[in-house]
C-alpha cells in the first residue's frame, strides 16, 4: 500500500467512533410463561387470598406453588454483602411458602363450612406429581431498610429469561435488571406485590439485578429465575 495513502487513511480511522456495545436483548420474546412466572403468580394470588380471606384463591395459590420444583440458583453472585440483620434478628426468614403444609392448614380452616372445598383441599394434599415438575431457581437474602442489593446473573442467549422478586411483605421492594452495557431491560418501582421481569438475551452474558428496599424495616426476599 502506498505510503501517501496510508497517511491519508490513518486520520479517517482515528476519527471513526467506536461503536458502542449494543444492548443484549433479542427482538424475539417468548409467549410462554415459565416457572418463575408461575411462582410469582402464586405469591400474588396468595397475597390476595390472605387479604380477602378467600379460600378459593388460597386453593389456587397452593396449586400453583406445588406445580413447581425449586433449587438454588447456580452461578448467581451477590455483589458484596448486604447489611447484617438488626439485633435482635427479625423472625421473618423469607416470603411465605404457598405450597407448604401450613398454607394447607389455613385453607382447611377457611373452608370449614364448605365440605366440597375441604374435599378439594384433601385431594390436593394427597396428589402425587405426575412426571417431572418444571424447575425454578431461587436465591434468598435479606436487606435492611433503605438499602439495596446487587446480583450478577449469567443468562444464555436466545433463551427466554424470567427474574422475579418476592419480599416478605414488611415493606416495598424495587427491581431493576441491566446488562453489561448498562442498558435497562426492566425497572419496577418499589411495591409490596411481587415483581417480574421477562426478556430474551441476544447472546450469552451477565446481567445485574438490583433490589432496593424502600421500606424502613428489614426485608427477607427471594429472587426467582426460570
Q: How would you label these PLM feature ranges?
A:
Residues 1-4:
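Positively charged n-region of N-terminal signal peptides that target proteins for export
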Residues 18-22:
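Boundary at the C-terminal end of the N-terminal hydrophobic targeting segment
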Residues 23-25, 118-132, 207-226:
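C-terminal edge strands of extracellular/lumenal beta-sandwich accessory domains
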Residues 48, 62-152:
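Non-catalytic extracellular/lumenal accessory regions of secreted precursors
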Residues 55, 142-206, 210-226:
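Acidic, Ser/Thr/Pro-rich low-complexity intrinsically disordered segments
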Amino acid at each position: 500500500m502506498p505510503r501517501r495513502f496510508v497517511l491519508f487513511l490513518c486520520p479517517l480511522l482515528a476519527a471513526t467512533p467506536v461503536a458502542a456495545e449494543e444492548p443484549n436483548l433479542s427482538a424475539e420474546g417468548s409467549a410462554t410463561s415459565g416457572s418463575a412466572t408461575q411462582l410469582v403468580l402464586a405469591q400474588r394470588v396468595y397475597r390476595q387470598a390472605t387479604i380477602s380471606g378467600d379460600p378459593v384463591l388460597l386453593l389456587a395459590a397452593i396449586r400453583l406453588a406445588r406445580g413447581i420444583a425449586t433449587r438454588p440458583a447456580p452461578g448467581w453472585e451477590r455483589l458484596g454483602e448486604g447489611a447484617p440483620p438488626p439485633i435482635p434478628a427479625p423472625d421473618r426468614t423469607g416470603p411465605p411458602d404457598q405450597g407448604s403444609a401450613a398454607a394447607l392448614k389455613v385453607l382447611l380452616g377457611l373452608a370449614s363450612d364448605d365440605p366440597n372445598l375441604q374435599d378439594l383441599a384433601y385431594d390436593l394434599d394427597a396428589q402425587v406429581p405426575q412426571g417431572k415438575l418444571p424447575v425454578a431457581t431461587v436465591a434468598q437474602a435479606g436487606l435492611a431498610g433503605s438499602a439495596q442489593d446487587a446480583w450478577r446473573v449469567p443468562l444464555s442467549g436466545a433463551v427466554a429469561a424470567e427474574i422475579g422478586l418476592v419480599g416478605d411483605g414488611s415493606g416495598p421492594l424495587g427491581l431493576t435488571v441491566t446488562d453489561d452495557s448498562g442498558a435497562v431491560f426492566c425497572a419496577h418501582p418499589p411495591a409490596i406485590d411481587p415483581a417480574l421481569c421477562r426478556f430474551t438475551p441476544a447472546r450469552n452474558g451477565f446481567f445485574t439485578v438490583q433490589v432496593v428496599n424502600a421500606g424502613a424495616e428489614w426485608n427477607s426476599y427471594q429472587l426467582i429465575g426460570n
